[in-house]
């Protein structure tokens, strides 16, 4: 009986050791939203770390918990993943870690919106909506997204020390690219007489603060064809900016009155490449956002 017990214990230990070695060999990291996916893909480029988004390009952040509860969502990849990278501290609907942990108790959570290092430099600038709720769109700030990349890079380097040098190199490159996007906008708008806009959403507050754009908020539901002129006059601006489309007749009226209507990407809905989330979707989107802003600001300044 003792011999049988010893054999069983030996087999159990051997199995656990083999599973642990397999887990350590894996270099799979999971994300769920565009901004974080782009950050992690960029800072792990040319390494053997595998980065996956559990969602394709058709899942909006607005879906919240229902997206994770979807019976068709395949979370089997979490079983052998080493870590998830989320922003749960600022976005209450980020259930990535919770659902991944149900599949894998050993999985590590890296929250790109919060550093446990105690380094004040990595503390993100946070804003609230007018109703008091936290504004989760922290990645719309250039400064914040660089900090998010640093937070993720630090933790990934700890998990995969053999990749630390390439992560550091990629982090430098990514940070420089983000700074270039911001500086490109600032250089092109430096001599403009007015940087004032009418914001139809609070989701762009981080971006406007970073770029020193003076904005007055107007509820998009309160904008009508009849009051466009009055809103322009009241806010001393003809540039309307939102993160989603409004009625075509209102857009036509804005343009008829010599104004501009812009839709900027907050990455609520991911960008697509071959049906999947675009690894460079965030960078592409921010470049396009800056191009739209520059064009609108310059055209209004000439009038």
Question: What are the residue ranges of the model-derived segments?
Answer:
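Sec-dependent N-terminal signal peptides
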Residues: 4-13
């Amino acid at each position: 009986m003792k011999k049988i017990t010893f054999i069983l214990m030996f087999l159990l230990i051997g199995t656990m050791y083999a599973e642990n070695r397999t887990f350590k060999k894996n270099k799979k990291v999971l994300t769920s939203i565009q901004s974080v996916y782009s950050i992690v893909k960029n800072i792990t480029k040319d390494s053997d770390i595998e980065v996956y988004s559990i969602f394709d390009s058709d899942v909006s952040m607005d879906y919240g918990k229902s997206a994770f509860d979807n019976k068709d969502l395949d979370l089997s990849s979490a079983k052998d993943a080493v870590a998830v990278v989320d922003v749960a501290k600022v976005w209450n609907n980020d259930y990535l870690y919770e659902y991944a942990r149900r599949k894998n108790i050993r999985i590590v959570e890296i929250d790109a919106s919060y550093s446990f290092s105690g380094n004040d430099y990595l503390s993100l600038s946070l804003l609230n909506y007018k109703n008091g709720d936290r504004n989760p769109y922290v990645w719309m700030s250039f400064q914040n997204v660089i900090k998010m990349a640093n937070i993720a890079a630090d933790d990934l380097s700890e998990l995969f020390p053999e990749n630390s040098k390439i992560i550091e190199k990629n982090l430098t490159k990514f940070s420089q690219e983000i700074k270039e996007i911001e500086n490109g906008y600032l250089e092109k708008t430096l001599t403009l007489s007015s940087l004032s806009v009418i914001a139809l959403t609070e989701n762009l507050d981080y971006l406007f603060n970073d770029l020193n754009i003076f904005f007055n908020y107007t509820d998009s539901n309160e904008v009508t064809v009849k009051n466009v002129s009055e809103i322009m006059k009241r806010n001393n601006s003809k540039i309307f900016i939102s993160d989603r489309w409004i009625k075509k007749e209102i857009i036509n009226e804005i343009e008829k009155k010599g104004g501009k209507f812009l839709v900027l990407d907050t990455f609520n809905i991911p960008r697509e490449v071959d049906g999947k989330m675009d690894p460079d979707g965030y960078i592409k989107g921010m470049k396009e956002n800056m191009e739209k802003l520059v064009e609108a600001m310059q055209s209004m300044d000439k009038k």
